[in-house]
Amino acid sequence: MAMKDSTMPNFLNIKNFDKSFDDLSSLSQLREEAFLNLKDIGIPSKKFERWKYNDLKNDIRNIEFSLCKTSIKIKKNKLDKFEINEIDYFKKNKNHYLQPLKYLKDEGVVNLNLSYSNLFKVLTIKKDLKKPIIVDIKSEGHGMSFPRILINIYNNVNAEIQFLNRGGLGFINQITEINIGKNSSVKISRLNESSSIHSETFFSNLGRNSEINLKNLSIPKNKSRFQVFNSFIDEYSSAQFKSVSIPYENSKDDFLVHNNHLSSNCKSDVGMRSILGKETESSFQALIDVENKIKNSRADQDCRAILLDEKASMNAKPEMKIYNNDVICKHGTTIGSLNQDHIFYLNSRGLNKFEAEKILLQGIISEYISEDSPLINFLPEKYK
């Protein structure tokens, strides 16, 4: 069925959960529970504080409510041994199916995915990895897709994972969950060059003395939303999120990062670098949440945007909810054009305007994406 111009997309106006959408009868009760939440909450629009820069409800109104072709391919080193499961994992572990609602119950896109998830990958990593795992998510054609990825990392494990999000002409609504055990570390490189309207909700749950380090390169060709929710479940855990955003012309890149310091002695570090050309827009919301009894927390937020055209725009909203004094927090936002004094200096050294700007922009990108990063190969040619 197709979405029509009404107050809500067509599939929200039906009285009952559309069980004809899939054949997962063993999970239908759980999926229907998520659907009822969705009907109460609705598809996100600018009236929701978390979505104040993005009107998803309007963006997907006319997209056909049918499945587009989507695949998730896992590429790994032959010597690395870990479990790969699909929907059977949730059939055997039904109590895990609605786990995202434990951390975020009032989010429409999460309940939408849980209602209609159609593609599943579950990775269970019990030992150190010798080489990075590559998770390649690719979509083709019109319609919608609701992929779900769950990664369980056991105690005392070091792992590296690369996510590639590409293609599509419709709407992709993805959930990614990573549970990180005690004394474990995961390094993540994420690429977004989706041509669909793309929404991903990313959860990480950090055990004692664990860490996650995420580097993101976002080059959307349409409207994109990446929202990250890090929960510090136990002490001495840390999360680092660094993102470079270079949207194509007439594209939009929207980010939200929520670091929830549920335990003492934890660190979070969030950074954003946006390079914005003609008819592009980027948004960055960062929230630090430190409860009253939580001690010795450290949290950093940093956002810098370079506007290369008068028709480029950047929105930034750093926010801190801190209920005690035993915390060190820093945040800063800088939005503007390239430094003309720096360009003049490079001109005086024999470089033309284009060459000077390229060097300055490469310097900004290299703050987060180093020469040895796998993301370097995906940068637009003019920034390599």
Positions of predicted regions on the chain:
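Short acidic alpha-helix initiation/capping motifs at coil-to-helix transition points
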Residues: I14-N16, T334-D341, I359-L360
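Short secondary-structure capping/turn micro-motifs that flank functional sites
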Residues: N54, Q362-G363
